[in-house]
Amino acid sequence: MVRGVVLFPGAGSSRDHAALLAIEKELSPLPVLRVDFPYRKAGKKFPDKAPVLVQCVKDEVRAFAREIGCDTTDLVIGGRSMGGRMCTMASSDIEDALLIAGVVCIGYPLHPPKKPEQLRTEHLPRLATKALFISGTRDEFGTPEELETAFALLPSPPAVQFIEGGRHELKGHDERVATLLKDWLRTV
């Protein structure tokens, strides 16, 4: 049984992103922690390098598990765009994998817009946890076809939900995203 959820924002937003707030509301009374990355807390606009962000994910998740009195394996982690990607990297780290119940990625940034050759998939074959990917069918960071090809790299098939007409930001779909996550948590 999932004991809590830890969420991280995308590169251009904060822990107060509408989607993360909607998820917290939908999952109540389940404990939800929304986290800002260190660069955001320092007032910087541009993200730190991936190792710093991944370490932040590990540190925050482990601290939250201690705070609510559970193991990290009782938690689901994830987030929007870069936040979700960093969570997949933390849980597939070769040297110090963060053991969790599952990971959710909202708008996984498979590649930079208009640069489909720059795939961010190197770690996916090591992602050995339950996973939910939610993306729009018009996401500039990965088409449904590109994402399905990338998801085939995972050791076991993830749950995938595409929101018709949604772009990367999934504006106007926050409640739908929250409901999809809540429904998926019942399977974890």
Question: Where are the model-predicted features located?
Answer:
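Serine-hydrolase catalytic machinery in alpha/beta-hydrolase-like enzymes
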Residues: 2-74, 85, 89
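The conserved beta1-alpha1 loop
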Residues: 6-10, 107, 135
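Acidic beta-to-alpha connecting loop that harbors the catalytic carboxylate
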Residues: 11, 137-139, 165-167
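Conserved alpha/beta-hydrolase "acid-adjacent" motif
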Residues: 16, 140-146
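Primarily recognizes the serine-hydrolase "nucleophile elbow" in alpha/beta-hydrolase
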Residues: 57-126
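Short beta-strand/loop motif that positions the catalytic acidic residue
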Residues: 127-128, 133-135, 139
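Catalytic histidine-centered segment of alpha/beta-hydrolase-like enzymes
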Residues: 166-176
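C-terminal alpha-helix
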Residues: 180-188
